[in-house]
Amino acid sequence: MSLFSRLSTWYFSKKSLPYWGIILLDCCLILFSALLVYTLNNGVLSTLDILGHLLVTLLVCLIPYLVGFRLFHTYSGIIRYSSFVDLQKVGFAVLFGLICVVVFQTLTDFSPYLVYIRKRDLILSALLAMSLMWMMRVFVKFFYVSTFRVAKAERAFIYGVKQGGVSLAKSIQNQDPARFVLAGFISDIAEIEYRYLMGVKVYPNDEELVSVMRKKRSNVLLVSPLKVEAIRNNQEMVDRLIKANIKIYMTPAAQEWDGRSDLSHTQLREVNIEDLLPRDKIEIDLEAVRKQLTGKRILITGAAGSIGSEIVRQVAQFAPERMVLIDQAETPLHDVRLMMARGWPDIESYTVVSDICVRERMEELFEEHRPDYVFHAAAYKHVPMMEDNPEESVRNNVDGTRVIADLAVKYGTRKFVMVSTDKAVNPTNVMGCSKRICEIYVQSLDQAIKDGKVRGRTQFVTTRFGNVLGSNGSVIPLFKEQIKRGGPVTVTHKDIIRFFMLIPEACKLVLEAGTMGNGGEIFVFDMGKPVRIVDLAERMIRLSGVKGIEIRFTGLRDGEKLYEEVLNEDETSKPTFHPKIKIAQVRAYDYADANLRIDALVQACAVEGDMQIVKRMKEIVPEFKSQHSKYEVLDE
């Protein structure tokens, strides 16, 4: 290693030079500049003859420059991070020193012991000194950036050239140590393609994107906040990047970024598959929801589950008076309790460990708290589990819903919002059928109240949607775990497709539907574009960077469909004022008949076997046709 390399390594290993070190360097540059200018104008021999007196003169002249350094704090910055502001401070300090020296010389004509220096030489030496001080700072910064700060940094392109992209670029340029080095921008705007921005070229977003990134030795794409939605909905671009093993990092989406504050590189995170699935931005009428929920008493069942806990979070933001949170899973409910204490300590909240099927306990809660709104998210949801345990599906899903619905009517709840599923449409499994029976019960009860057959004021609203990303036991966490173990990734069928929605987005629509509903509606959500599960698995494998992972087809599970629906063939829908929510026009049921049939079904669970229970369910829901299940014999 050369002496220069050793010195530079030693210097940059320090946090910064001490104040006195920076001042000493600047003073040396001023003295050098003055000596050089004087020598060039008066000759070497003449300078050597008076060198002693000249040095004394220059040291005296240095005093006002030192005062200027103190006034403008030129020494307080870290040289390797010098900016235009630091150069400006140096300029002001040198100008101050020059003016003081010229004024001093004019007023005193220098003492007999000092050498007279012409004003022209004073000005030239000051300009040279200022230039050298600037050059020293720029050189140190450039050398540090090009050699030390970016030694282990990855070359990255930024997708997006507007405010978000520029803010992100500034942030990564100020990282220390550098995580990324800016290699270029990607733009969808034709007018600025191949121009330069912040010293790098802007490239078009076309089929040559991967090739361009390879030429620039980059395998990282940073997505600006304003382009998050664009990349999600450009699946062709995403596929090209994933196949080329380009790492994609995202910042907060535009709705999470205020558009004014600078983005921080710490906000960048490598994408998950959930980030890249196509979906539309969902906005709801927050003011309408706020008017309904603020200052009200809210009861939420299944409050510790994936959907329930997100409903808790979203409802809490509207400052209700009281929240009663029910779940039979103690540990996750404790987590919800801690979340409420930490995030919303001013809301009166009660976490209740209980089974919703225990009518006596539920009645105690309704009598004590008398909720204005009930969000009913409690349910068993795993299809294979419910195929094996139909009596529990009936007990928890059907009878539990009936208990909560009846008590809501008895204690004057204004609105009851039930979370249903697309598996309730043309059900092929026990779980889906149990949820369809729940829909039938709350709809018929709502109509009975409207017809005056049941006394009460409660409005019953049902929300029906499909798979949510990241929920407990869903396919994405399963695939992640299988990839982590090295495979194989198991898919039930090569043609199976599903709709996906983020949990927060689904819960937003639940709140919106709950506030817009007048009772008796089944709201169905627009779930966006369907996703082939095998394509999802392939993407996740590529995104992980792990090679050689097999995808194994295991066959459809008991009761599993190839595709899900939100309406059956006899149902139609009509639009609402929200583009993502429609109202299903479904067959009406008589409340007394539905209640009688459900009574018989619940009682049968205590004395009859699985086949008899499922047979009764099929009598209530004639469109329930079992698939890949032992119950198919009942359809013959």
What are these model-derived regions, one by one?
Residues M1-K152, F180, E193-Y196, N219, ...:
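Signature of alpha-helical transmembrane segments in polytopic membrane proteins
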Residues F4, N234-R297, V409:
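Flexible, Lys/Arg-rich cytosolic regulatory linkers and terminal tails that connect or flank
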Residues L40, V44-S46, V140-D258, T331-D335, ...:
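A solvent-exposed beta-alpha-beta segment
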Residues R232-Y249, R322-A329, E368, D388-K415:
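NAD(P)-cofactor binding segment of oxidoreductase domains
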Residues N245, A288-Q292, S444-E636:
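Strand-loop microenvironment adjacent to phosphate/nucleotide-handling motifs in alpha/beta enzyme folds
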Residues D258-R260, H376, H382-V383, E387-I440, ...:
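Conserved Rossmann-fold NAD(P)-dependent oxidoreductase catalytic core, especially the SDR/UDP-sugar
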Residues I298-A316:
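N-terminal Rossmann NAD(P)H-binding glycine-rich loop of SDR-like oxidoreductase domains
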Residues V353-Y373:
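Conserved Rossmann-fold cofactor-binding substructure of NAD(P)-dependent oxidoreductases
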